[in-house]
Amino acid sequence: MNKIDFDYDQIVIGSGFGGSVSALRLSEKGYKVLILEKGLRREDKDFPTTNLDTKNYLWRPELGFRGTMQFTFTSKTTILHGVGVGGGSQIYANVHLIPPDAVFESEAWTKIRKDWKETLKPFYGLAQRMLGTANNTYTNIADDTLKEVASEIGYADSFKTVNTGVFFSQAAGQEGQLAKDPYFNGDGPDRNSCIYCGACMLGCRNNAKNTLMKNYLYFSERNGVEIRPSSEVVKITPLNEDGRAGYEVIVKETLGKQVRQYSLQSRGVVLSAGVMGTVPMLLKMRDQHKTLPNISSLLGQEVRT
């Protein structure tokens, strides 16, 4: 086979938690990396101020809605997931919980390996450091009401504040103030502390939420990773039978009213478009395009999101 002139060493599909971590760690190893994201790239000021601003809140591009929140409906569930550079980190509730033992001990996990808890333990610490995990001590009348209800039904001990990925002020009266990077010894972006506005799931306009643009993607771009928004992958084809020779990726780019389709070649591909992006894409490649026929028939089973 002739030597292939690859466009990239690795193409990462999706810019959420999985894609951003993959891109950063690959770039640290010296690989040339491209992130493809079907949604838009936003500055903090571009997030909507209300979910009634449907064009900037919801993702329904066929209706002209190019927001951050996509709804996927199945026969049993309604799933909300993030779209845009930063993925779900833009609009999730910031809560950082380590699963209880019952999760690690469930059959879906233990039939693969028995030591998940110990295996993952050091990586939870690393993720917490990168995402700026801190305990949210703020409570209001809604929290007080929940605490009272829990007490009335005999579950008072279950009430607690949670760890979140938000930059909180270190002293009362300093909410919203600008501070030099508080997480990476001054090597990361400057931040403003939380003003407790409650707009976390609309998108933080105040530079306080520790979205992936403030950490993993920030350092990825500094390492030379390229991020292409408005770029949706429509086909993945291995260049030989098992993909060892690399892959061709067909991309549909939508910028404004302009649409173009082009192909890229890379040594490897990382699919990290979230459960509702990655699983349907793999099913499509296996069953419709038949470019990835060796994907397991178990794809889509035992899924957690």
How would you name each of these model-derived features?
Residues 1-118, 277, 292-305:
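N-terminal glycine-rich phosphate/pyrophosphate-binding loop and immediately adjacent elements
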Residues 244-250:
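Short, hydrophobic/aromatic-rich segments at coil-to-beta transitions
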Residues 6-7, 28-30, 78-79, 84-86, ...:
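Short, well-ordered loop/turn elements at secondary-structure boundaries
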Residues 28, 39-49, 206, 222, ...:
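Glycine-rich loop(s) and the adjacent beta-strand/alpha-helix scaffold that form part
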Residues 113-230:
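Conserved redox-cofactor binding core of oxidoreductases
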Residues 7, 66, 197-200, 234-237:
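A glycine-rich dinucleotide-binding beta-alpha-beta segment and adjacent secondary-structure elements
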Residues 15-18, 142, 208-212, 262, ...:
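Short, glycine/acidic-rich beta->alpha junctions
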Residues 17-21, 75-78, 142-148, 213-214, ...:
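Short alpha-helical segments and helix-capping/turn motifs at coil-helix boundaries
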